[in-house]
A protein has these predicted regions:
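Conserved SAM-binding loop
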Residues: 15
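Helix N-cap/beta->alpha junction signal
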Residues: 18-19
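C-terminal accessory helical subdomains adjacent to catalytic cores in phosphodiester-
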Residues: 1-12, 23-47, 58-182
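Short, conserved secondary-structure transition motifs
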Residues: 48-54
Length: 182
């Protein structure tokens, strides 16, 4: 596991999240002071949330990068697909983009937290983590209110660290959420 924490020093951070689950995870970590930056260093979305839902790079640049910030910007993407491209327009190519992957799905953290690993291993080739969790715990696992109540900061950190031990990285350059933790 490599640490990428130092990349965020002296930067304004844009946290782009694939969906609601990723948003809640990142907001919980930010609220708990577990990320290498504070809420004061984050670009907020139009509702003043410290995370931004995923959007095409061109739209993201138009909406957020044409504004003036007190420090250089760094983009932190949290998503499950290592194949998704995110190419900023030419005028913004000097902005660093760091991707943290939660493949195959972020619901994998729930499986680890609930200690369902042995059951999951038996069905993982034919069942998505989200479907596996919906069958066992709650059909609302993608809803923000449910996720906010489900995850404590401590449980979330433990699941993220457990994931880093069972996850097979596709390459040395692949980062996970554990790389952001102290």
């Amino acid at each position: 596991m490599s640490s990428i924490r130092s990349l965020f020093a002296d930067h304004t951070v844009a946290i782009l999240c694939e969906g609601s689950a990723e948003r809640i995870v990142m907001e919980k970590l930010l609220e708990g002071g577990l990320l290498p930056f504070s809420a004061d260093d984050v670009i907020t979305d139009e509702w003043d949330r410290p995370t931004i839902l995923r959007m095409p790079a061109k739209k993201f640049a138009r909406v957020y990068l044409e504004l003036a910030y007190s420090q250089p910007v760094i983009v932190l993407r949290v998503l499950d697909s290592v194949h998704e491209k995110f190419m900023l327009p030419h005028a913004f190519r000097e902005i660093p983009v760091v991707s943290c992957y939660t493949r195959p799905e972020i619901e994998r953290l729930i499986i680890l937290h609930e200690d369902w690993e042995s059951e999951w291993q038996k069905v993982k080739k034919r069942t998505k983590p989200s479907d596996f969790c919906k069958e066992r715990i709650d059909s609302r696992i993608k809803q923000e209110d449910w996720l906010r109540q489900y995850w404590s900061t401590e449980a979330l950190c433990a699941a993220i660290r457990a994931y880093s031990h069972v996850h097979q990285q596709a390459s040395e350059d692949e980062h996970t959420l554990a790389d952001l933790l102290p």
